[in-house]
């Protein structure tokens, strides 16, 4: 058994992870969290909440997982959320084209076109691993689970592929909550769905998974000189830049460069201070939940693998024994792509008014309608036209004026109808105006976390074996059971004292487990295996001097303290 198999065996035995639908044969891409796994995962999430909600001042929302078609059409997911698919001509089994190539040839398929993938399959004579048959042509497969809303299937929808869109859709409400003052951030934690073609990587590649995403809305002019960056600029991180990835003269080790965030921004490796800051926040979070720092790196996306919405993106990748480096966090500059897309498709104004440092004199177009002609032509819709003209930005106004001058007409599209405007319907003249602010479409920095992958890596990085025990060396922040409480023997009042102590620990918010079965050494081993950092034993001395033995998991050190000091001692150590 390799390390992965040992961990999966332990997690199944001890109630961390179980195959979903197991009594019906199971389905690839789905896992259940058992009692200890659910606590572990929630501890990871709550630590994440501490970093983003408590420390960073974001607020959390909770939106539906079923998402109307038009939302994901506007966001680009209907067109772009795809993977390359190959299907066997003989057995009709489907596979990810890029994965099947990498399993047979030592080559990186990241960013390759469908044609390039097809050529690789043909050149290397790659066959179906199930039956040895030939593959059909490589095609694209949309990863979203399709569904419908209501009877009759009239309202097309999808299970959401990411939690982020719920935040963008509610941007106006969120902005009002923050009194329309940039910058501000919102987070959402919940299920997302991707209909993976052939998930064969256990808990690493799931069809239903938990995301924790933050959307930080900021004036694009503030990204370069981000106020909070000063506090993290000297943090040194292992960076794998896009430039180094493409430099074939460098070895794999040479491509990763350790440098401060300050130098990375200064040298143009990281786009700006705002994205660098959230890379630092990500590192702090991963360290607190027990990720091995030597198994962490930050890799920049290459241009040909960048998401359709991103201007720059860095992945926090964690090393695993079986699967190598896996992407667990993406920190992306989504620019104003999403807000612009939803503005265009919903006709809602998703801009924010920002005050200028000083008053500014600008030239703007002033529109004067020929109300007689407009009223005769558009009748009851004249008011809609007037309001729509007021909402036009400078670029659209320039476009309108130029079209009327050169072509004599212009079609203005609104959410209610299209207006075909003729030159005689209005006059537009430039006037000077003093303004105290302006409307902008905020840019978005998005830290997006795959909670399930992170939780698995927490388990793998915590897993240790020696001659006589297996240990899950969880950090205090995430360990599911905080204290094991044991009576040395089941007599002389020791069980009653132990049970009373367990109840006091629980009353103080600590999950404590009572165990009176087997030799004390076996009980320690059971607690080590599930990552419990402290064990307390009630023994003969407890009956005479009210002291107990505390045993620490990692050092195995044992010492005595008064029983009435156990709760404050452990709370202090855990914090």
UniProtKB/Swiss-Prot annotation:
A single BP term in Gene Ontology: glycyl-tRNA aminoacylation
Protein task: Catalyzes the attachment of glycine to tRNA(Gly).
NCBIfam families to which the protein is assigned, alphabetical: glyS_dimeric, PRK04173.1
Species this chain originates from: Methanococcus maripaludis (strain C5 / ATCC BAA-1333)
A GO term, aspect molecular function: ATP binding
Sites where the protein binds ATP: 194-196, 204-209, 327-328, 450-453
Record-given protein name: Glycine--tRNA ligase
CDD domains: GlyRS-like_core, GlyRS_anticodon
Cellular component, GO annotation: cytoplasm
């Amino acid at each position: 058994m390799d390390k992965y198999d040992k961990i999966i065996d332990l997690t199944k035995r001890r109630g961390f992870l179980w195959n979903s639908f197991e009594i019906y044969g199971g389905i690839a891409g789905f896992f259940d969290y058992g009692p200890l796994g659910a606590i572990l995962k929630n501890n990871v999430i709550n630590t994440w909440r501490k970093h983003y909600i408590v420390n960073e001042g974001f607020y959390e929302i909770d939106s539906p997982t079923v998402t109307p078609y038009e939302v994901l059409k506007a966001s680009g997911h209907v067109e772009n959320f795809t993977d390359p698919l190959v299907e066997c001509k003989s057995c009709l089994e489907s596979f990810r084209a890029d994965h099947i190539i990498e399993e047979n040839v030592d080559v990186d398929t990241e960013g390759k076109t469908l044609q390039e993938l097809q050529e690789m399959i043909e050149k290397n004579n790659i066959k179906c691993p199930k039956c040895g048959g030939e593959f059909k042509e490589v095609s694209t497969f949309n990863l979203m689970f399709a569904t419908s809303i209501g009877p009759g299937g009239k309202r097309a929808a999808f299970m959401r592929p990411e939690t982020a869109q719920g935040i963008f859709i509610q941007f106006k409400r969120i902005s009002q909550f923050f009194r329309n003052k940039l910058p501000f951030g919102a987070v959402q934690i919940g299920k997302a769905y991707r209909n993976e073609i052939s998930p064969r990587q256990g808990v690493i590649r799931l069809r239903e998974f938990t995301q924790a995403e933050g959307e930080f809305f900021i004036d694009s002019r503030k990204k370069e000189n981000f106020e909070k960056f000063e506090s993290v600029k000297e943090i040194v991180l292992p960076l794998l830049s896009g430039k180094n990835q493409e430099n074939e003269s460098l070895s794999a080790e040479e491509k990763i460069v350790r440098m401060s965030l300050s130098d990375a921004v200064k040298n143009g490796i990281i786009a700006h201070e705002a994205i660098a800051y959230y890379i630092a926040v990500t590192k702090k979070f991963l360290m607190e939940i027990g990720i091995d720092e030597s198994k962490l790196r930050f890799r920049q996306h290459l241009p040909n693998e960048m998401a359709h919405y991103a201007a720059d993106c860095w992945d926090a990748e964690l090393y695993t024994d079986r699967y190598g480096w896996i992407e667990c966090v993406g920190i992306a500059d989504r620019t104003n792509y999403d807000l612009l897309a939803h503005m265009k498709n919903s006709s809602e104004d998703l801009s924010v008014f920002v005050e200028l440092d000083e008053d500014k004199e600008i030239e703007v177009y002033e529109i004067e309608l020929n109300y007689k002609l407009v009223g005769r032509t558009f009748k009851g819709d004249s008011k809609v036209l007037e309001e729509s003209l007021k909402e036009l930005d400078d670029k659209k106004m320039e476009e309108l004026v130029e079209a009327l001058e050169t072509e004599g007409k212009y079609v203005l599209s609104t959410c209610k109808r299209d207006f075909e405007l003729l030159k005689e319907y209005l006059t537009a003249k430039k006037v000077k105006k003093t303004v105290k602010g302006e409307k902008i479409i905020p840019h978005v920095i998005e830290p997006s976390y795959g909670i399930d992958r992170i939780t698995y890596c927490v388990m793998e990085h915590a897993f240790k074996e020696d001659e006589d025990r297996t240990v899950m060396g969880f950090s205090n922040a995430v360990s599911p059971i905080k204290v094991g409480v044991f009576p040395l023997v089941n007599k002389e009042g020791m069980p009653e004292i132990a049970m009373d102590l367990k109840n006091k620990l629980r009353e103080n918010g600590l999950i404590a487990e009572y165990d009176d079965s087997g030799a004390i050494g076996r009980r320690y081993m059971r607690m080590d295996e599930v990552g419990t950092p402290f064990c307390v034993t009630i023994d003969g001395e407890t009956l005479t001097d009210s002291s107990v033995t505390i045993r620490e998991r990692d050092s195995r050190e044992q010492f005595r303290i008064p029983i009435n000091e156990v709760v404050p001692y452990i709370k202090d150590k855990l914090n």
